[in-house]
Each structure stands twice: as structure tokens, then as C-alpha cells.
């Protein structure tokens, strides 16, 4: 069934947005036996938390922190010699974390039979 067919379906609960609040509400309603749909205006689930707020900033911070620990750990002395870790590379690492979070959250909706309408 495509998203265009969603308007012909009936739901017990319709949740606006798939951020943390919407996700929690949708999962609780689904587990209570309700037929649930989530309306998401963006192309991926997760809301601001996943795409531009909490997750990206923490992923970038963790990547930088890990790099600093690696560079200062005597066990790895010289391991990065001649190699450069660039800011675009750190952003790429953070982006991969975001994609992983989207996949996890998409799995929540699928396993709980919650329809996401985008």
C-alpha cells in the first residue's frame, strides 16, 4: 500500500510528527492495541532530535572526543602520523550515526505496525 492510499484507511490514533514525543505516543498507542498512523512532514522519521539537534551534536562531539583520546593515548603513538582527520570527515561520521538512528526508529514503527505517512 502506498502513502497515497493512506487517506482511505481508518486509524484509532493519528500522531503529528515522529520526534521523541510523537514516537513515544505512537508506540504507547500501538502497544495498547490501537491502529496508529504518524504524519511526518520530513522525508525521514526522527524529528529535530535525530536530524539537527541532539543526535548530530552528540555524535560530532563524541567523534572529536574519541579522536583526542586516540591522539593522546601512548598505545597509539604515531598511528596517525602522515594521516589527517578533517572536519568534513568528522561530519561524515556524525552523518552515519544519524542514518543509523533513522534505521532504528524506522524499525520501531515497522515492528509496532505504525504507519508513517510522509
Give the ranges of each region predicted by the language model.
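Glycine-rich Rossmann-fold phosphate-binding loop(s) that bind the pyrophosphate
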Residues: 17-20, 43
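Short glycine/serine/threonine-rich phosphate/pyrophosphate-binding segments
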Residues: 21-28
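Glycine-rich flavin
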Residues: 2-5, 10-11, 28-34, 40-118
Amino acid at each position: 500500500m502506498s502513502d497515497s492510499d493512506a487517506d482511505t484507511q481508518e486509524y484509532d490514533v493519528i500522531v503529528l510528527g515522529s520526534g521523541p514525543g510523537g514516537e513515544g505516543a505512537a508506540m504507547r498507542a500501538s502497544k495498547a492495541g490501537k491502529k496508529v498512523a504518524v504524519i511526518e512532514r520530513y522525508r525521514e522519521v526522527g524529528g529535530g532530535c535525530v536530524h539537527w539537534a541532539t543526535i548530530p551534536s552528540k555524535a560530532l562531539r563524541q567523534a572529536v572526543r574519541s579522536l583526542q583520546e586516540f591522539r593522546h593515548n601512548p598505545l597509539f603513538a604515531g598511528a596517525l602520523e602522515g594521516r589527517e582527520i578533517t572536519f568534513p570527515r568528522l561530519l561524515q561520521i556524525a552523518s552515519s550515526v544519524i542514518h543509523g538512528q533513522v534505521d532504528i526508529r524506522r524499525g520501531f514503527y515497522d515492528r509496532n505496525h505504525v504507519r508513517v505517512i510522509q
